[in-house]
């Protein structure tokens, strides 16, 4: 996977994708899940245990997810837009890249001044973490403090799987868990993590 895809260009430009296609897809899936439940209630005699319970639970869980996920996306979109506004108001230099992250997945040598860090901007000076509440960077990692940029890995059923970006700094390791896009709650997979690592490495002056 190269770094010229549309998702990478949106991160370079700091674009939050519109929510309506995402919401429409969720509404469509919700309608399907509800339709399956109605069909089962009207025409299918479901056993009280075993596989029969799964026939009811699967569409029910699908319906619940179709409600919860769009709400999470709306919340993340609002949070990221505020963090972006703070970053743009505070910096006189346009970032070369925007890296949305999972706030709960950040690991740093020192406690963050704001645990709700939503994204990092990247420019010739380094990486700067932003939250929706602060007009100043809540995390600052200059390039001269970054020694290496690697993939963070973990053991997953006997296999090493990439789950984040590992920054080896002079103050200790910093681990970031990127999200797939601004305004989206989903974390990226190993293939996209490799692209993000390459983008960060190429951003170093």
Task: Show which residues each predicted segment covers.
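Anionic N-terminal interaction surfaces
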Residues: 1-22, 48-122
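Small side chains
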Residues: 25, 54, 62, 126-129, ...
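Alpha-helical transmembrane segments and immediately adjacent membrane-interfacial amphipathic helices
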Residues: 29-37, 62-69
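Membrane-interfacial hairpin junctions
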Residues: 35-55
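Short regulatory "switch" loops immediately downstream of catalytic or recognition motifs
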Residues: 39-41, 101-105, 152-155
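Phosphoinositide-binding peripheral membrane targeting modules
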Residues: 112, 116, 123-162
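Short beta-strand element of the conserved SAM-dependent methyltransferase core
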Residues: 121-123, 166-167
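Acidic, Ser/Thr- and proline-rich intrinsically disordered linker/docking segments
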Residues: 147-205
